[in-house]
């Protein structure tokens, strides 16, 4: 039995009132329901909800598919456009951190209050601010895509303000420590020290070293071509945190670069080439040696020379610092490092330029004296 205003008497004796929450992906209306023992009880519950969702639909649009449904749709749209490692990272962060918190909200129900609650929930999980920022950047991509597809009208997640993060500055090795590490790396058998030398003399990332093939090294023209990386990424079953190794093109166009081959590095690489027959410079049965193995060898080497609290990426940082100390220009150093901009290089290695600053001040003093 029906008595107007979308209120019904059900077979079980209860009254039910329905209100429109928005539209489904297929364009059909999505309804919400309230229940009560009488027509008047249901009516009193129904009117505030009708008004609430009328306001939501006018302000934010008709899309009532859940955020989780939209996120999964977005995954299918972007999968062929981005690297597998990037896709796995996006998928893990949304499925592990975001969907459990806000996945059941309809797109048009998402607002600043929901965004703020998510931010607080992530903080309570003791996540670093940098990680939370990364999660929100992914959410913003999904929401901005929803706006482009005319599913919603605005992105409330852009309203969240994050606390400033004090960047931890990486320390380059001293010249003395660098020499000790290099000497030990050269003494290592079976080429186990080669990754250390590639990082210190060419500024390569660990994944770039793992992917490096002999055909990428031009000994005649003294050049190393960098275009690929070998790394661990989350598998498609990424909720269980299983990983797999993939060989793929470098992360950005700026990461694809040509690096001059130093004479020290050339000598060591030629010796290494005589000992190995595989395609890869750092080989494991004619397969690229995985980054974790290279890192393991590095830690064994640095412990032999009593270097504590040093991680592999500091070797790359040391290479750049030595270039700056040698009065290399920022544009060239940025290109060697594979940075996306010279600003990034300046921001990262500004402290290493103190000697240049001192010289500038001295020149200024001479000019006015």
Region spans (language model):
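Short N-terminal "domain-start" leader segments
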Residues: 1-12
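C-terminal catalytic core of tyrosine-transesterase DNA break-rejoin enzymes
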Residues: 148, 197, 201-208, 300-304, ...
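Catalytic-site neighborhood detector that most strongly recognizes the C-terminal catalytic loop/helix
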Residues: 168, 230-232, 337-363
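N-terminal core-binding DNA-recognition domain of tyrosine site-specific recombinases/integrases
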Residues: 38, 60-63, 75-156, 167, ...
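DNA breakage-rejoining catalytic core of tyrosine-based enzymes
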Residues: 32, 108, 152-154, 164-183, ...
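Active-site/catalytic core of tyrosine-dependent DNA strand-transfer enzymes
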Residues: 239, 260-308
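Basic, Lys/Arg- and aromatic-enriched nucleic-acid-binding interface segment
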Residues: 133-135, 148, 152-154, 159-214, ...
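N-terminal DNA-binding module of tyrosine recombinases/phage integrases
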Residues: 10-16, 21-113, 275, 281
